[in-house]
Amino acid sequence: MSARVAVSQPVLSWALQRSERTFEEALTKFSKLGDWMDGSGQPTLHDLEKFAAYTHTSLGALIMPEPPDEALPIADMRTRESAAIERPSGNLLDTIDRYQQFQDWYHDYALEQGAEKLPFLGSASAQDSPRVIARRVRSLLQLDHVSATGTQQWRHDIVAALEGVGVLVMRSGVVGASNTRKLSTREFRGFSLYDDIAPLIFVNVADEPYSAQNFTLLHEFAHLLLGHSALSGGDRLLGGAGEEAWCNRVAACVLLPDEALTAFDDATTVLDYRAVARRFGVSAEVAL
């Protein structure tokens, strides 16, 4: 007879939550899940191994009496309807961990190649004028020389400019290479990982238009200018408070400097605004 393993309902619920699986979905794969949850039955070790793989959790975590405290390793700047977003998903945590490991490796590699601290990192303060900082960013990234006329080309040129000054830029809509683990833009739009040698920006591209990706790239770059790692996103592209609002303003001013605003003078409808906004790689929301 197969050995049974004691599991707790809070841990099973936590595993489902972090993997964004519902009880009903899991029940189609594990017919005795209800028994495990109410304590009237226990899974075999093989059952639990399959459940761990299904929920993308470790077997060790599933046999603990209480769920582990999985705190975000970087500052959480996200809000939804003006409230903080409480518990991160396993997809988000695993994505941050994946790129932290890559950043650590690249940091050591870059040092071996003689890399030094990038001078623009930590060079700004949230008390600085967003317009002033935006002008510095446009100069640093040489965006005044960009001839893009559409949001996709702007995305290409912004990524190239960031990489050109030493920023690692990563984009994906899934966890690693797993197409079954899709990232949610409702949960986050991107994050920045500060490092003197190997600063990194990650953009969640799952179902995100290029205009939103452009904004996120520059928003996260603004966090690096402040010298911080940060997780950004939620239910609004614009808005927020404190540092997040400052980074939003910088990103908007980089994409739409004062001299570009005259291009909207003849726009009279939303369609007009959208057409002009695309020329500058932004959404109508940012333009308005």
Predicted regions and their residues:
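Short juxta-domain linker segments that transition from a proline/glycine-rich
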Residues: 1-288
